[in-house]
A protein has these predicted regions:
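Short linear motifs at protein or domain termini
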Residues: 1-99, 207, 211-215
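Alpha-helix N-cap/N′ positions at the starts of helices
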Residues: 66, 89, 113, 175-178
Length: 215
């Protein structure tokens, strides 16, 4: 029986910093002073530095040992570029995942569980968006192209952050619940073409919202 390792102090600090960055409490460009943050969170500098290294690897923090750390800046152009990358990769990964998992009830169960967790997430927006990412990750989990999945995971946290921009500009005309239910339904029924179409439309709509904010 495999047990899940207990969270470390670095894990706890990582989660706190991540949430504050994603929710905008720590603004783009804000300095992240190890001593100040360690005192604020009641931890030693060691787990703080480890958390900063992790966040830097994900692109959420700009960190250099001799120059200190700052919250990474995020331009609208960066967000648009990332959504274009998602459009190129994620529909392909989703289609391959569903075809590979055809007839396997464990895949359907995992996707349903991730969807239920997404629906129950909150109250913070960062928690909701993290669960949203978890749902999308479950959908693509059976993709046999592991380099593609690795690339998608590499930009996942930046994508969560940029979703804040799309959420802030949302007009209310989109029925996101319906979009995600359609993704769930297509995936668990093994309808790869339908799922790819829904995801493509979903990503294009989010990209359009980002571009609309620039007008």
């Amino acid at each position: 029986m495999t047990t899940t390792p207990a969270p470390t102090r670095a894990d706890w600090v990582d989660a706190r910093l991540r949430a504050e960055i994603l929710e905008g409490t720590l603004a783009p460009g804000a300095r992240l002073v190890v001593g100040d943050l360690a005192e604020r969170y009641g931890v030693s500098p060691t787990p703080l530095r480890e958390a900063l290294r992790r966040l830097a690897a994900e692109g959420l923090v700009d960190w250099q040992p001799q120059r200190g750390a700052r919250v990474a800046t995020a331009t609208r152009r960066d967000a648009e570029d990332l959504y274009e990358l998602r459009l190129a990769l994620e529909p392909v990964a989703l289609g391959q995942s569903i075809v590979t998992a055809a007839g396997d009830p464990a895949y359907a169960d995992a996707v349903r569980a991730a969807y239920d967790a997404f629906c129950a997430a909150g109250p913070g927006l960062a928690d909701v968006l993290e669960a949203h990412h978890g749902f999308h990750a479950a959908l693509m989990a059976r993709c046999p192209n592991r380099p593609m999945v690795t690339a998608i995971e590499r930009y996942a946290q930046q994508s969560v952050r940029f979703q804040m921009l799309a959420t802030a500009g949302r007009s209310g005309r989109r029925d996101l619940d319906a979009e995600h239910r359609a993704l769930l339904d297509a995936a668990v029924r093994g309808r790869a073409d339908d799922a790819v179409r829904v995801l493509t439309e979903h990503l294009r709509a989010s990209l359009a919202e980002l571009r609309a904010r620039a007008d």
